[in-house]
Amino acid sequence: MKFSYWGAGILAVALTVTLGSNTLFASQPLTAATEYMQKNDSDSIKVENLAKELKKLKPISSDDFKSKFKKEISGFKLTEATAFEDKETGSYATANYAKGSKNVYLMVTDGAGAGAEQVKGNLLSYLELKAVEEPGDKTNIKNYKGWSVYFDHSMYENDKMTSIQYLEGNRYSVVASGTNIPLDELKSLLDNISL
């Protein structure tokens, strides 16, 4: 497609006027949008650098992975722990903790070696969600253990389900799902986990 000099000039003026006022539809000054983009870019670079370092590491063995789960955390007792090794996707493990009617299920992926791509993908998706997050959403992206991570209340109040997806120890991608446990109590339990 060829543009005439007039067409290119009109397009340049239109872009300058649009970007010079407020960003389209957001009613934010260009400086605020630019600052957010720069922060998001620096967060993305941080994620990329982490993934490069994780790829260099050797994945944890299944026996060592299972042994990382404490028998009891904040009154929750470990009822089950399993771990697996896969050359294509890396090592991963699951654990279940229970206390009365409260239940916390953990799915953990070792970010070392092949698992680095999953860790990278998760962290980048949290950054993307943060960009569209609105007040009142049941899903919130918060800073937790040094990274932007996913905090989620259930869509339905009566099912009492919560979820936190985060990065533990700059290596392990954790999905923690709770039943009959409020989000703040789930976070408190996760504060006491160290892999």
Residue ranges of model-derived segments:
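Long, hydrophobic/aromatic N-terminal blocks
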Residues: F25-S62
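Short, solvent-exposed recognition patches
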Residues: N49-K160
